From Swiss-Prot:
Topology relative to the membrane: Multi-pass membrane protein
Gene that specifies this protein: CNGC17
Function according to Swiss-Prot or TrEMBL: Probable cyclic nucleotide-gated ion channel. Forms a functional cation-translocating unit with AHAs that is activated by PSKR1/BAK1 and possibly other BAK1/RLK complexes. Required for PSK-induced protoplast expansion.
PANTHER family named among the record's database cross-references: CYCLIC NUCLEOTIDE-GATED ION CHANNEL 15-RELATED-RELATED, CYCLIC NUCLEOTIDE-GATED ION CHANNEL 17
Topology Cytoplasmic: residue spans: 1-85, 143-178, 233-252, 399-720
Entry's transmembrane regions: 86-106, 122-142, 179-199, 212-232, 253-273, 378-398
Protein name: Cyclic nucleotide-gated ion channel 17
Domain of life: Eukaryota
InterPro entries (alphabetical): cNMP-bd_dom, cNMP-bd_dom_sf, Ion_trans_dom, K_chnl_volt-dep_EAG/ELK/ERG, RmlC-like_jellyroll
UniProt remark on domains: The binding of calmodulin to the C-terminus might interfere with cyclic nucleotide binding and thus channel activation.
Native organism taxonomy: Eukaryota, Viridiplantae, Streptophyta, Embryophyta, Tracheophyta
Domain IQ residues, every copy: 617-646
One annotated GO molecular function: cGMP binding
Length: 720
């Protein structure tokens, strides 16, 4: 025991293991059973006496592995949650990047405008862009630590395949596939261009800053947008859908459409600024005068330069480039200049450009009036193409998601229409049609068009059992007949219960019909009646409420030691008074449950069955009624016997006094006459009563008693 407790091994000098070592290694109950010999022979495991302490390799390995070296399962919960977080961060990053297009702006006054850079906006956008880049960097790290399913593994024939957890194989596969795209999407290229490239080449900033920013952002925007596609595919493979609700899916597609409008509006803005400054440059290069035009004069940083101020007073560049004069054709960019969009505050610029982009995408650019400038016409063509594709994509996906909200309702409407056509074709009477309509309506309200039985049968057995237990256990325990059973038997019952719905006026079973299931009422009321009382004119009716059951003839049949295949007949007619929800135990399932009943050996269960059985209740009521009648008859017989004895005694006394009565007949008092009349009436009543008792005895002999229900066998286990 001491060796087993400490898990110690001893090795002989010639290299043979001792019996103790073999015992410890071969014992499956020992923690050392999973360990290999090399892990036990490490020097740090040595103990005095040439003994080694056997440690749990799994625990020591897990304790030494750091969190950043852990390999993740691509289908695990943490990877799925990260994919959701990353796809949200990607959407935010895609909205942030086009904001760089609003950094170039037009400053100065109306008469002497100049090109400027919105520094405060640059700082703000750079800050949020850097945070978004950190999410991309973290995503690269997670992909280096996420396993994958072997593509050529033979295990993919069945199941999902073999999961590769080797860090080197994971890294090599990632580098060969998506690493380059992820790296390009992660690089902070706009920050580098704005804060390092343009700042160091200040003299050339006016010529190149707009084009450089637009080019860098657009080139990096493509791989960033591409990352959303495989990410959405991974979420769909793992969960089946991108969004959990239809409204979220519709909002997601609408957000993508707004993103396209956002990008289009930002591109239109920077092209408008570029078109405006291009006019300045062309007029500046062609201007000749006392003061030559220099390109840096057009920059707001040189506004306080003496030469620039002298040139601004005599130049005609700004007048010739004014969109109101019509000297220079701006085409689709004219509104940005005439409405001072390029010189407004950021929020004014942004929302106007967003509206312009949304308007052009929705109208496919039909209201655009372009010039002969090739760049402008190309931009208009792209607007028409992307507008058509994106709008069709939006409408299609929105329709799909929104239709999924009412797909069940639409199926029910189609089924209802088909049912109406069928009833009209078969010329069913209005009463039957109303019953069919009520049943379909009630079934829809109860299930919302979901076939619960098919849904549960498609799930694994263990999961189906847990769901049935959650749905049925509390309701089953409300039935007193089931409240006496243990949890194991209740689980078996819950697993076999099926829901049953009945509308008002429905006959669940009629007297004499075969019984195929036993019902346990959850909600509603049923009327159970019978005319089989053993005599003509017998009628008994009771109301079954939640907690009651009907069809116990099937239980008595199932509890028979050798029950036949023929189902029993119903002795009662059961009709729904209102809408009823119940659980049903079918005959084959009840046979299994009945076999479990026998193993309980419970008299209490037998008494509970008697108490809540309407057959036993009816028999008990008839039995008590018959006993009460017998008691009343005995009391009446005793009273009549006493009256007859009194009559006999009075008769003897009357014969002895007959002579006296005759002599005193003339002098008879009114009181004597009254006594004599009472005696005559009493004798007549006694005679009639004797005849009634005799007739009642004959009647009791002729009328059979109400048949006692069969006693279900709960106490013994029988061999098949």
């Amino acid at each position: 025991m001491e060796l087993r407790k400490d898990k110690l091994l001893m090795f002989y000098s010639e290299g043979k293991e001792s019996k103790e070592a073999k015992w410890a290694v071969n014992d499956p109950m020992s923690k050392s059973y999973k360990l290999s010999l090399p892990s036990a022979l490490r020097p740090d495991n040595l103990l005095p006496g040439n003994r080694l302490r056997y440690t749990d390799a799994s625990k020591s390995k897990s304790s030494k592995v750091s969190w950043y070296k852990t390999i993740l399962d691509p289908g695990s919960e943490i990877v799925l949650k990260w994919n959701w977080v990353f796809i949200v961060s990607c959407m935010v990053a895609l909205f942030i990047d086009p904001l760089y297009f609003f950094v170039p702006a037009i400053g100065g006054d109306k008469n002497y405008p100049c090109a400027r850079t919105d520094t405060s906006l640059s700082i703000l956008v750079t800050f949020f862009r850097t945070i978004a880049d950190l999410f991309y960097l973290l995503h690269i790290f997670i992909k280096f630590r996420t396993g994958f399913i072997a593509p050529n593994s033979s295990t993919r024939v069945f199941g999902r395949g073999e999961l590769v957890m080797d860090p080197k194989a994971i890294a090599w596969r990632y580098i060969k596939s998506d690493f380059i795209i992820d790296l390009i999407a992660t690089l902070p290229l706009p920050q580098i261009v704005i804060w390092f490239v343009i700042s160091t080449t200040k003299s050339y900033r006016f010529d190149h800053n707009n084009n450089a920013i637009a080019l860098i952002v657009l080139l990096q925007y493509i791989p960033r947008f591409y990352l959303i596609i495989p990410l959405s595919s991974q979420i769909v493979k793992a969960t089946g859908v991108v969004t959990k609700t239809a409204w979220a899916g519709a909002a997601y597609n609408l957000l993508l459409y707004m993103l396209a409008s956002h990008v289009l509006g930002a591109a239109w803005y920077i092209l408008s600024v570029d078109r405006y400054t291009s006019c300045w440059k062309s007029r500046c290069n062609g201007e000749a005068g006392q003061v030559n035009c220099q390109l840096y004069y057009l920059d707001c940083d040189s506004m306080y330069d003496n030469n620039q101020m002298t040139w601004a007073n005599v130049t005609k560049v700004f007048k010739l480039c004014d969109a109101r004069n019509g000297e220079f054709k701006y085409g689709i960019f004219g509104n940005a200049i005439t409405k001072n969009v390029v010189s407004s505050q950021f929020f004014e610029r942004y929302f106007y450009c967003l509206w312009w982009g949304l308007q052009q995408l929705s109208s496919y650019g039909q209201n655009l009036s372009t010039t002969m400038f090739m760049g402008e016409t190309t931009f208009a063509v792209l607007i028409a193409i992307f507008g058509l594709v994106l709008f069709a994509h939006l409408i299609g996906n929105m329709q799909t998601y929104l239709q999924s909200l009412t797909v069940r309702l639409e199926e029910w409407r189609l089924k209802k229409r088909d049912t109406e056509e069928w009833m009209r074709h078969r010329q069913l009477p209005e009463e039957l049609r109303n019953r069919v309509r009520r049943y379909e309506q009630y079934k829809w309200l109860a299930t919302r068009g979901v076939d619960e039985e098919v849904l549960l049968q498609s799930l694994p057995t263990d999961l189906r059992r847990d769901i049935q237990r959650h749905l049925c256990l509390d309701l089953v325990r409300r039935v007193p007949f089931f409240s006496q059973m243990d949890d194991q038997l209740l689980d078996a019952i819950c697993e076999r219960l099926v829901s049953s719905l009945c509308t008002e006026g429905t006959y669940l079973v009629r007297e004499g019909d075969l019984i195929s299931e036993m019902l346990f009422i959850i909600r509603g009321r049923l009327e159970s009646s019978t005319t089989n009382g053993g005599r003509t004119g017998f009628f008994n009716s009771i109301i079954l409420r939640p907690g009651d059951f009907c069809g116990e003839e099937l239980l008595s049949w199932a509890l028979l030691p050798k029950s036949t295949l023929n189902l029993p007949s119903s002795t009662r007619t059961v009709r729904a008074l209102v809408e009823v929800e119940a659980f049903a135990l079918r005959a084959e399932d009840l046979k299994f449950v009945a076999n479990q009943f026998r193993r309980l050996h419970s008299k209490k269960l037998q008494h509970t069955f008697r108490f809540y059985s309407h057959h036993w209740r009816t028999w008990a009521a008839c039995f008590i009624q018959a006993a009460w009648r017998r008691y009343k008859r005995r009391v009446m017989e005793n009273n009549l016997t006493a009256i007859e004895s009194m009559e006999n005694e009075e008769g003897e006394v009357g014969e002895e006094l007959v002579v006296v009565e005759e002599e005193e007949c003339v002098e008879e008092s009114p009181r004597t006459k009254m006594n004599l009349g009472v005696m005559v009436l009493a004798s007549r009543f006694a005679a009639n009563t004797r005849r009634g008792v005799a007739a009642q005895r004959v009647k009791d002999v002729e009328l059979p008693r109400f048949k006692k229900p069969e006693e279900p066998d709960f106490s013994a286990e029988h061999d098949d």
